[in-house]
Design a protein with these regions (language model features):
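Nucleotidyltransferase catalytic core that binds NTPs
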Residues: 2-11, 15-18, 24-320, 331, ...
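Serine residues within intrinsically disordered or low-complexity segments
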Residues: 3-7, 17, 26, 402, ...
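Intrinsically disordered, low-complexity tandem-repeat regions
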Residues: 11-14, 19-23, 28-33, 385-401, ...
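Acidic/histidine-rich
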Residues: 307, 311-359
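Generic C-terminus detector
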Residues: 348-406, 416-439
Length: 439
């Protein structure tokens, strides 16, 4: 990707950076959508072209069906952004090109009637549900779009050819739907990144709007594949989000220790204990040791975050049923390469694992060096966060004791995110990025 998917607010003017826009979840929800008029269901590109487009802009939400609240959040965000004069198109297409050998193409849920109902209730004007022959006339295309080096990492390494299939169908659906805006969930962070890069490199005149991950009350990221999980498997699957939250909280604890070390200074041990006592600490000696450790630079954000997440995942591997880890990676959002231990700035902590026969993915966005002025400014400037997690860097711990407690793998259950209420959009004047198929 030319630039990070962690990017400015969707209300900012379009520019030539090709950055994925992100919905800000800090605004109150918009009024309920009037679903008295059902969405038009069309199956061909010709039928879609024949529908009146109106005077506003068109937004598209690309899905593979089996719609759930995560998809509804995308549709509502699109509805709010385009306003009453705009048009929201939801595509429902299970793309065979992005399934590898032995994957779940045949059993992938297909619930079109329910999908149309949910889409209409969330604010969609049109549901475009083409057949495989409509999208790929004459069979699988001989020419496909290659995802390049970024598409060979993580998900691409585990599922060879997956992102080539994603990019090929996204390009075709963008041509068929001709949107001005495209909305995509941040749960599939690598997919969002490769599609944004494709849009930048190939000059698609579409603006991406990234929408924060939607989670269940217990933290599990919403996915169409969650329905495959049995009760015990679902309990094990909670380790994915728990691992991410543990890394977030441990990072916050480390930053608190570093800030305290800076405030106490490099005094001899007795003076340090006295300084901590003056701050109101009850356990001055223990805290002095922890602060001295932080001041010496022994803690490193990326290494500590990885270790905290791995501890949770290692425990989950011993559950019944067990979690089988595919990867845990802390990556630079611009190219999805692993970040070094000295890294400062925004990063994505991504995890993929199997529980039973179901493969699940999740991610969280972290800021390393959050207490430093330059990192804080970047984090507050509209960059992406996982809205469910009320601040991925976590709250600053008040004491070294609470900092240690924050390294526990347990984390509070996140609340459901709100979706930005944004004013009607105008068509972008410069090429932006498109939106990919929602998994």
């Amino acid at each position: 990707m030319t630039s990070s998917p962690l990017s400015p607010h969707p209300d900012q003017p379009a520019d030539a950076s090709h950055q994925a826009r992100t919905a800000d979840a800090s605004h109150p929800p918009a009024p309920p959508v009037d679903a008295s008029h059902p969405a038009h269901l069309v199956h061909t590109a010709a039928a879609l072209r024949d529908l009146p487009r109106g005077t506003g802009v068109r937004a598209v939400v690309m899905t593979m069906g089996a719609l759930h609240e995560g998809h509804a959040t995308l549709i509502r965000a699109a509805r709010r952004r385009v306003g009453p004069a705009g048009q929201v198109v939801v595509t429902v297409f299970v793309n065979p090109l992005q399934f590898g050998a032995g994957e779940d193409l045949d059993r992938y849920p297909r619930t079109l009637d329910a999908d149309v109902e949910l889409a209409a209730a969330a604010g969609a004007d049109v549901v475009f549900a083409p057949s495989v022959d409509e999208v790929y006339p004459g069979g699988e295309p001989q020419i496909r779009i290659a995802a390049g080096p970024m598409g060979a990492l993580l998900e691409g390494a585990s599922r060879p050819g997956h992102f080539d299939g994603v990019l090929t169908v996204v390009a075709k659906l963008l041509h068929l739907t001709a949107p001005d805006l495209a909305f995509y969930g941040q749960k599939d962070a690598q997919q969002l990144a490769v599609i944004t890069r494709m849009a930048a490199d190939l000059n698609f005149p579409v603006e991406i709007v990234g929408v924060p991950t939607v989670r269940e009350d217990d933290g599990l990221a919403l996915s169409s594949r969650n329905r495959y999980l049995s009760g015990p498997e679902r309990c094990t699957a909670l380790a994915l989000s728990a691992a991410l939250f543990a890394a977030r909280d441990r990072l916050a604890a480390e930053e608190a220790l570093r800030a305290r070390a800076a405030s106490v200074g490099h005094h001899p041990a007795p003076d340090r204990a006295a300084a901590l006592a003056a701050l109101g600490e009850d356990r001055a000696a223990a805290d002095a040791h922890a602060v001295a450790y932080a001041a010496a630079g022994a803690l490193h954000g990326p290494a500590v975050a990885r270790a905290a997440a791995l501890a949770v995942l290692d425990d989950a591997a011993r559950l019944d049923p067990p979690l089988t880890l595919d990867y845990l990676a802390l990556v630079d959002p611009s190219d999805f390469t692993e970040v070094p231990d000295a890294y400062e700035g925004e990063a994505i902590l991504a995890v993929a694992a199997k529980v039973g026969s179901t493969r699940l993915i999740d991610n969280i966005r972290l800021v390393f060096g959050a207490g430093r002025p330059e990192a804080t400014a970047a984090h507050q400037g509209g960059t992406t966060t996982d809205a469910v997690d009320t601040g991925d860097t976590g709250d600053t711990a008040d004491t070294a004791t609470s900092a240690a407690a924050a390294s526990s793998p347990s984390a509070p259950s996140p609340s459901a995110p709100s979706v930005t209420s944004t004013p009607p959009a105008t068509p972008p004047t410069t090429p932006q990025g498109p939106l990919g198929a929602t998994r």
